[in-house]
Amino acid sequence: KKPIEELMAMVGDAKRIGIVGCSSCATACATGGPKEVAELKKYLEAQGKEVVVTGMAEYCCMNLGVKGTLKPFQDKNLDCVIGMSCGDGVQCVAKNANNKPVYPSNNTMYLGEAVKFGVWEESCRFCGDCVLGKTGGICPVTQCAKSLMNGPCGGQKNGKCEVDPENPCA
């Protein structure tokens, strides 16, 4: 888990918050299951935040499941969503959160994402210092061929990666 102070710094002045937990790995790791979602909700409300909606995705790292989990989050006028999963799950939530800021509650160490049955794509190295809350849900450590954290390298052209011009610059 991230230190609560770090999470609260990301949440900042947001008042209306949604929380998404993960029924799979994060539940098994006690970092984002129903118990932890309830604990975070209670903490946020004690800090004067309004937790408008919570949900549990079977797997936060599966886009199709996350889409269904986030349906109740739509039209709630949320200021942000907190993803209580691995960094990969937070990225899936961010892709489906209707452009709301999504903040990670955990510092993930490693993982990949199921693109389709039997095909996996590395999307998070669980580096232990998750920056997805600052990068719009894009992990520069895994999605940049050079793992740059300070912006594009000098070799990118027209928003394309220097190492593999087929890929967009992270």
Predicted regions and their residues:
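Short secondary-structure subsegments characteristic of cysteine-rich extracellular domains
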Residues: P168-A170
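Iron-sulfur-associated redox domains of electron-transfer enzymes in respiratory
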Residues: K1-Q156, E162-P165
